[in-house]
Amino acid sequence: MQTPLQSPPEGRPRLLIVDDDALITDTLTFALGTEYEVLACESRSHAIELLRQLPEPPALALVDLGLPPTPHAPDQGFRLIADLLAHSPGMRIFVLSGQNDAAHARHARALGAAEFIAKPCDPAALKKILARALTVRDAEMRAERERARDAEELIGQSPALLKLKSQLAQFADS
């Protein structure tokens, strides 16, 4: 059996769920566990502790706004969004919360959340949202790798660099 401190198995991206309601985390783990390696936490502090132990961060996170010690206020959830992005800027964070007024949704997005999803939500719709986010993330990562490779080729083959390499080779021979 795999422990959360190991890398996720190939083909199953890691999903962090942070919600203080065990019924929610259990239901989401059951609904999403075939597509994702689900890691569930009940608080901001537990999520941060877990992140520090992982060899690589989760690709996705579902975050409730109302977390202990103030479950009826969004402060801990907002702080967690900032914490997650500071730890892993490429992580896609989705707020899944019953505290779904427009101001909270705007603030969560301003902090870097990809989307705000109101509770209760349809698990099938949530699966589609997460799958789409992974597709976009993977495309962005491929494009970034290609840009880096192209830049390396450009720099490595520029006329000035080729001339310098030639001069260094001549100098090394003397």
Which residue ranges define each predicted feature?
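Active-site beta3 strand of CheY-like receiver
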Residues: 55-67
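C-terminal output helix
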Residues: 103, 121-130
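Short hydrophobic/Thr-rich beta-strand motif most characteristic of the beta2 strand and flanking loop
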Residues: 35-50, 72-73
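Short amphipathic alpha-helix used as the core "switch/output" element in two-component signaling
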Residues: 49, 71-90
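Two-component/phosphorelay signaling modules centered on CheY-like receiver
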Residues: 22-40
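AAA+ ATPase active-site-proximal loops
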Residues: 145-174
